[in-house]
């Protein structure tokens, strides 16, 4: 899962990004509205954390431009002012949730998880595919009720496949969602991680669609 953080306070932005990375997300950051708008408009993200008080282009303008351009990723708005009028403006511009500063990082993480679940049409934080269960709140995985230990990349790949269960996901799309920009994006590594997951979760846990990509079963 890829998250964009647009926050001009470098210290706070680093804290948010660090907490998201520890939770298993791939994070990209922007310090001003123009950079944030560009990243959100040209790259695929599963959710955005967007501050309103940005230099260059304020958060409301950034959000409106995204929505005008057909960008539908869920957006969590951050602001230093807990004003009802500002909330209304943010929601009218296309925001999905709202969090006033200061806030507890655990609440921000919970709201991001909820946004991603809602955007995927799910209310349950536990993803299920056959005998496999993945709890998105803590990243734990079980097979027939028995805990399975996964590496960070294995967990990211599994969560992405399970979030999009029933859909065929190509290598390029998978790479964009589970690898940070500064890492080697060799598509052959996707095959390596798929093989590892099959060893741990069963040979039929992930289906290969010849010439297209991979798919996990729903429910």
Where do the PLM segments sit?
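Short strand-coil-strand connectors
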Residues: 8, 128-130, 137, 144-146
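The C-terminal output helix
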Residues: 114-127, 166
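Structural detector for helix-capping/boundary residues
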Residues: 43, 52, 106, 130-132, ...
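Short acidic-rich active-site patches of cyclic nucleotide enzymes
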Residues: 96, 212-213
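Positively charged, aromatic-enriched patches within helix-turn-helix-type DNA-binding elements
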Residues: 140-205, 210-212, 218
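N-terminal/domain-start alpha-helical segments
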Residues: 1-119
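A short, compositionally biased
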Residues: 121-122, 134-140
């Amino acid at each position: 899962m890829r998250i964009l953080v647009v926050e001009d306070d470098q210290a706070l932005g680093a804290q948010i990004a660090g907490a998201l990375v520890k939770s298993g997300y791939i994070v990209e950051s922007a310090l001003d509205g123009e950079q944030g708008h560009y990243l959100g408009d040209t790259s695929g993200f599963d959710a955005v954390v967007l501050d309103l008080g940005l230099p260059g282009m304020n958060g409301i303008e950034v959000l409106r431009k995204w929505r005008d351009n057909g960008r539908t990723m869920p957006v969590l708005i951050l602001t230093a002012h807990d004003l009802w009028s500002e909330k209304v403006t943010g929601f009218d511009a296309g925001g999905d949730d709202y969090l006033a500063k200061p806030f507890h990082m655990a609440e921000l993480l919970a709201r991001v998880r909820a946004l991603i679940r809602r955007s995927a049409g799910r209310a349950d934080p536990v993803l299920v595919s056959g005998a496999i269960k993945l709890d998105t709140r803590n990243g734990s995985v079980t097979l027939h009720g028995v805990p399975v230990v996964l590496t960070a990349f294995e967990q990211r790949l599994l969560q992405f496949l399970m979030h999009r269960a029933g859909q065929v996901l190509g290598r390029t799309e998978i790479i964009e969602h589970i690898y940070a920009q500064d890492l080697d994006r060799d598509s052959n590594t996707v095959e390596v991680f798929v093989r590892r997951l099959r060893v741990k979760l069963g040979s039929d846990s992930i289906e290969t669609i010849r010439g297209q990509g991979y798919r996990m079963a729903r429910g």
